Amino acid sequence: MRALAVLLLLSAAHPAVAQGFDTVISGGTIYDGTGAPGFRGWVALNGDRVAAVGSGEAPKAARTIDATGKAVAPGFINMLSWATESLMVDGRAMSDIKQGVTLEVLGEGWSMGPYTAEMKTVLARQQQDFRYAIDWTTLGQYLAKLEKAGISPNVASFVGATTVRIHEIGAGDVDPTPAQLQSMAKLVREAMNEGAMGVGSSLIYAPASYAETPELVVLANASAGCGGSYISHMRSEGAGIEAAVDELVRIARESGGPAEMYHMKLSGKDNWGKLPAVLKKVADARAEGLDIRGNMYVYPAGATGLDASMPTWVQAGGIDAWVARLKDPATRAKVIAEMRGKPVGWENLAQSAGDPSKVMFIGFRNEKLRPLIGKTLAEVMALRGTSAEDTIIDLVIEDGSRVDTVYFLMSDENVKATASLPWVTLGSDAEASAPEGLFLKSSTHPRAYGNVARFLGKYVRDEKVDTLEGAVRRLSGLPAERLKLADRGFLKPGMAADVVVFDPATIADRATFEKPQQYAVGVSHVWVNGVQVLADGTHTGAKPGRFVKGPGFGKCPA
């Protein structure tokens, strides 16, 4: 009787119930993204929308998908994606679609606009395996270009604090004048008006590290005034992490907007015990009424470059100036001395890893160096007969790049503890990849292929850090609320038809650090805007993804 009442209610609101839907997903356990317990039922799709959700007998449809024994959830949101370039060359986003990701959120400190003519020239020269014309200027133009070209997932972006800084004052270690800072804030507002989600920073890297807190407050205030949030790779995730959290909280307090920590982690064994202090600072800020959250990838290693193992002053002005300084014997000697000492005002991730065997190279620009992909710093030191510091410096010079590098930095215990926090969402901090073509020229971090699946399999199912309904909320409804998305993140009538069907009993990551380019398993079906992009685990080739606009779109005056 209850099922009949539900169906009749939905029929009144949605006439298509009586007439038949485009697609009905039936027999699965529905997790609607709110954190409510799942229930056995059906989800109906019409066009690009969820038309109805109910229990009991499923209504008629042009196509019915049997989801018996599986979970049906809103499409997952990747809160930290580096699919900026990978989507330019392969819009399928295979590694993420196969995990149920339907929205890639870009913009960790660096964004694909706004650019000056000089920035375009430099970026074109620095392109590696992925080559494309930079025929846009603003961030909104880039995102619109992706949609027009065809992409399988939806895409959104924060505007990069680093990007607007370079736009106005270059890559040097200088402070903006008041007029330049106002121009930077204007660029943030313009990006918000185009649809950016907020402003993002990445403060351990040059030239982002040159920005002082008041500068970041001004940019965060510009974002908050347009409804956006501030999101940050904080100034330290190691010895200085408590001060870094204090800075994030200060920026939230003074800007009046929400703030979020990228890839919440504690780097270096000496810092692993600081997690309780960090969580207390967040709890105190939240009790004060500040909206502080975080996101993470569920691995004990991070991936970045060798720039994160050198003092930031030597990197001022960009890669060409950096390499030129390293070639100067006196400067090189000074850099080596600082790399061997205790870092002051910067993070040395090679030092934090604790041993050269815990630093692995995964990507080079120089073809001659590519045989070193997959080798550790210790192995390359042995091959060359050089010290850790000399090896790092030589590789940067020879490659003319920061060199893509994995650092084993975190404890499994802290990863598990952080993965249990109800205010922490998931972000891969990686490209959307495929084990084919250009992607095979380099390696990657396994998080590119397994972050969501590892969370749902290893951590939720096996280690029970959260309920399944709580985990789905943190992959869908919670990030959608943070981004102020009015029509995504939940399985409710009228919402965008971004849907994933997966098997909670079998979902798992297969990618490892030794063999990272392996797809996850357990996701059978994915829809993006009502179009099926994954059917029985196979990509359909469809590219219905859209540029998802942020809260200031069209209403944020510059």
Please tell me what each predicted stretch does.
Residues A3-A13:
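Bacterial N-terminal signal peptides
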Residues H14-A18:
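Sec/Tat signal peptide C-region and signal peptidase I cleavage site
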Residues G20-T23, I30, T34-G75, D90, ...:
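Histidine-rich, glycine-flanked metal-binding segment
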Residues G28, D328, A417-W423, D429, ...:
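C-terminal cap of metal-dependent C-N hydrolases
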Residues I30-W42, V403-L409, N414-V415, E463-R473, ...:
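Acidic, glycine-enriched loop/beta-strand segments at the rims
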Residues A67-T137:
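Metal-associated gating/positioning segment near the N- to mid-region
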Residues Y142-L146, I151-P178, Q182-Y205, L216, ...:
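Active-site neighborhoods of metal-dependent hydrolases
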Residues E190, A196-E247:
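Divalent metal-binding pocket/active-site signature
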